[in-house]
Amino acid sequence: MKAFLLIFLFVSVSLGCSKDSTSLGEPVEIYLLKDFQLLTNKCQVDPSASSLQFTPTVANGEILEYSSSDYQFKLKATALERIKTLSDRTPFAVTVNKEVIYFGFFKPSFSSSSCDHSITMDLSWGQANRILMRLGYPGVPTGVTIEDERNNPRLLAALQNQGKLR
């Protein structure tokens, strides 16, 4: 009877245990925008007139690491394939626990249009499965200031708690 009770207890505890991703900290995700407006005469999302899509384009589990020195996310191949399908100037938001840290635009390196007032996302052609977050596209013009939240403390803390910060 004792053996049966011990086996039952062991099996119950084993089956009841599951990996809880929330115990690793707040999720970091990248969302496309369902609705948005631009600030007048700027390539910049108006935060007061935007909303996130229901599901993330890049889920927390698809972010493998983030390099704070060169602003690169390393993604699972499936997430990178979704990023590759985005059109030029597709707006996105980097979030922590579904709260927007910053907005930006997908700007592939072959784009002929500029985006002077926002963080931009591009594929990293030099390294596999990485996306770059840059200030402006093709760069920041003289006299333009972009609020740089790429290394926002809350974002870095969430990534650090998950062991994804490099």
Where are these regions (language model features)?
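Sec-dependent N-terminal signal peptides
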Residues: 4-13
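A structural signal for conserved, well-ordered secondary-structure elements
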Residues: 23-166
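Bacterial Sec-dependent N-terminal signal peptides
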Residues: 13-25
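Solvent-exposed, well-ordered amphipathic alpha-helical segments
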Residues: 2, 15, 75-76
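Positively charged n-region of N-terminal signal peptides that target proteins for export
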Residues: 1-5, 18-19
